């Protein structure tokens, strides 16, 4: 995904305020052994880009002054109550070094799960993104979590996710192996099932 930014020379609270008033958003580009670069982006274009999942989880081609560099979006600061992006941070990517980043999880086959269809189970998505490490060339836009066979009372953990070649969970996620999704039967559904079973077991009065 291509992103266009422009060099900026002024920094500080006053300069950033004037920039925002003119429809621009200040940002920085850092990392990969190069100097930190001050940039500005068109606010409306940035606002719409931030609505796309791919903008948050993919390597971006950032063009500044006619030169392109590969970056990851690392931080976004929003105004607390206005639809306004205050600042963005981009980190340069080194093609030869593994990067640590979070990618979104896409949950698949939930509607066709037998526990959902036959037992009224509810599948909760406990986390919606997970931290991985890989070379930039292997970075996936998202990871799929297959919920087709999860049974009521059971969970899917981080280590159950099928990872593409060259991708691994970061060390602390590997060690903790957190729950990603869990299937439970609501108390109301259990009570209804017990009541139905009790009704079936009653002997009709003579």
Curated annotation (Swiss-Prot):
GO terms for cellular component: cytosolic large ribosomal subunit. One of its GO terms (biological process) is translation. One of its GO terms (molecular function) is structural constituent of ribosome. The keyword Endoplasmic reticulum does not apply. It comes from the Bacteria. Coiled coil: none annotated. Keywords: Ribonucleoprotein, Ribosomal protein, RNA-binding, rRNA-binding. This is one of the proteins that binds to the 5S RNA in the ribosome where it forms part of the central protuberance. Belongs to the bacterial ribosomal protein bL25 family. CTC subfamily. Part of the 50S ribosomal subunit; part of the 5S rRNA/L5/L18/L25 subcomplex. Contacts the 5S rRNA. Binds to the 5S rRNA independently of L5 and L18. This is Large ribosomal subunit protein bL25.
